[in-house]
From Swiss-Prot:
GO molecular function, a single term: ATP binding
Annotated metabolic or biological route of this protein: Cell wall biogenesis; peptidoglycan biosynthesis
Matching Gene3D superfamilies: Mur ligase, C-terminal domain, Mur-like, catalytic domain, NAD(P)-binding Rossmann-like Domain
GO biological process, one term: cell division
Main location: cytoplasm
EC number: 6.3.2.9
A cellular component annotation (GO) from this entry: cytoplasm
Lineage: Bacteria, Bacillati, Cyanobacteriota, Cyanophyceae, Oscillatoriophycideae
Record flagged with keyword Nucleotide-binding: yes
This protein's encoding gene: murD
UniProt-annotated binding residues for ATP: G111, T112, N113, G114, K115, T116, T117
Protein name: UDP-N-acetylmuramoylalanine--D-glutamate ligase
PANTHER family (UniProt xref): UDP-N-ACETYLMURAMOYLALANINE--D-GLUTAMATE LIGASE
Length: 462
């Protein structure tokens, strides 16, 4: 019996373990952590015949035939390097799913920003057209969960991160989309060139490539990579990288794809030019899949957006509270500010990331009346604000204080919106950006239950 070891006890790791067990493998699953919840999962998986090792650091063994890596595990981990050097096949969970789901067609969507919204909208269009096309990867299902289902998908709509691409050596989607490219995850990938090449590799292996021509870096650096690629632009056909016959663009208020009018852009409910860019890419995918315009229009009209991305939470005393927790870098946070009407009270901070913050700082100067800083990056971001002589900021440390203080200051500064758009990772205070956004949501919704004086003066008695 072949033996596999899965690293990581999250949703992806558990799904990979169950998939291999179902297909006759001897399976062990490990995680460096231990907790009550993991121990409960351990009991269940042990009953299924899967060996679980908690509080365990992986080391390759000669008895292993396969090592599966969950998305959050660094690909250059010394133990994984030794595994590869000794000839043990070492792949990611997404690659494993691909091998079991080759009978389904795949859409692979990658990019620094925009991939979650594009993935969710694409899946919504396909499902409106009557196809079983679940979203998976970074959102929705773990990819291996789809391979475990009795009914296999017509299409797999996969949001694929750079981490997942580098651990997937044969993953070759029929259609691949590259949404944006900016400096991110450099602590993982070391330099911009390496990060770019990892993203590009997914498109190299795909049959149809769709790229966002409104992204400056892609426009300047990716045009020569793919000879028959398709390009989008919200700025019209004059801005297309490709010939107009391979373009998807806006013209006279319409989405035009491959020289055919598809839908009026006004059907899109989401705010911001970046969401129009996402729309064009999703429509392009739909047309290559043969979906009718009526289904595209119906799906776009009813698509509300994705949680934690410019998500409207509530209105308190005439001020809107907006959750943009998924803005984990400067470029995404700048896009969020561009999409909203000034004056804005901004909550930012978390775990700092490398990147160019010039556009983000420019948007703050133009649109923001006050900034509340949270997390380990608070002092660093305060210094960046001082550099542009923006002194309307306060370090409040945590989200609870930020929401209370934001509610109080919103009246003083006549802000239309209190916006959580961190421009930082979440791992200093939260498990992920979703948890951070949920905390913001609950605190914002709870404002109506606070004492008026506590909110009026931004009380920290909480």
């Amino acid at each position: 019996m072949s033996k596999a070891h899965i690293i990581g006890f999250g949703k992806s790791g558990v799904a990979a373990a169950r998939l291999l067990k179902k297909n006759g493998w001897e399976v062990e699953l490990s995680d460096r952590n231990t907790s009550d919840s993991l121990q409960q999962k351990e009991k269940q998986l042990t009953q299924e015949g899967i060996t679980v090792k908690l509080n365990y650091s992986f080391e390759p063994e000669t008895s292993l035939d396969l090592v599966i890596v969950s998305p959050g595990v660094p690909w250059d981990l010394p133990a994984l390097q030794r595994s590869r050097e000794t000839g043990i096949e070492t792949i990611g969970e997404m690659e494993l799913a691909w091998r079991y789901l080759k009978s389904s067609s795949w859409v692979g969507i990658t990019g620094t920003n925009g991939k979650t919204t594009t993935t969710a909208l694409t899946a919504a269009i396909f499902q409106t057209a009557g196809l079983y096309a679940p979203a998976c990867g970074n959102i929705g299902y773990a990819a291996c969960e789809l391979a475990l289902q009795d009914t296999l998908p017509d299409w797999v709509i996969a949001e694929i991160s750079s981490y997942q691409i580098e651990s997937s050596n044969t993953l070759s989607p029929q259609i691949a989309v590259w949404t944006t490219f900016t400096a991110d995850h450099l602590s993982r990938h070391y330099n911009l060139e390496n990060y770019f090449n990892i993203k590009a590799d997914l498109l190299n292996r795909s049959q149809i490539q769709i790229l966002n021509g409104d992204d400056y870096y892609l426009h300047e650096n990716a045009a020569h990579l793919y000879h028959n690629s398709y390009w989008t632009s919200i700025q019209g056909k004059a801005n297309l990288v490709a010939d107009v016959t391979r373009g998807i663009y806006l013209e006279d208020g319409w989405v035009v794809a491959l020289q055919e009018k598809i839908i009026p852009v006004e059907l899109l409910q989401m705010l911001g030019s970046h969401n129009q860019q996402n729309l064009l890419m999703a429509v392009a995918v739909a047309k290559f899949a043969g979906i009718e315009n009526e289904a595209i229009a119906e799906a776009v009209k009813n698509f509300p957006g994705v949680p934690h991305r410019l998500e409207y939470i509530c209105r308190w005393n005439g001020v809107d509270f907006i959750n943009d927790s998924k803005a984990t870098n400067y470029d995404a946070a700048a896009m969020g500010l561009k999409a909203l009407v000034a004056p804005i009270l901004l909550i930012a901070g978390g775990e700092a990331k490398e990147g160019n913050d010039n556009d983000w700082l420019r948007q703050i100067k133009e649109k923001v009346v006050f900034v509340l800083l949270i997390g380990s990056a608070a002092e660093f971001l305060a210094k960046r604000l001082q550099k542009i002589n923006f002194l309307n900021y306060e370090i409040v440390e945590n989200m609870e204080r930020a929401v209370i203080r934001g509610a109080a200051l919103s009246k003083k500064y006549d802000a239309k919106t209190v916006l959580l758009s961190p421009a930082c990772a979440s791992f200093d205070q939260y498990q992920n950006f979703e948890e951070r956004g949920e905390v913001f949501r609950q605190l914002s919704l709870g404002l109506n239950h606070k004492k008026k004086n506590d909110i009026r003066f931004g009380s920290s008695r909480i």
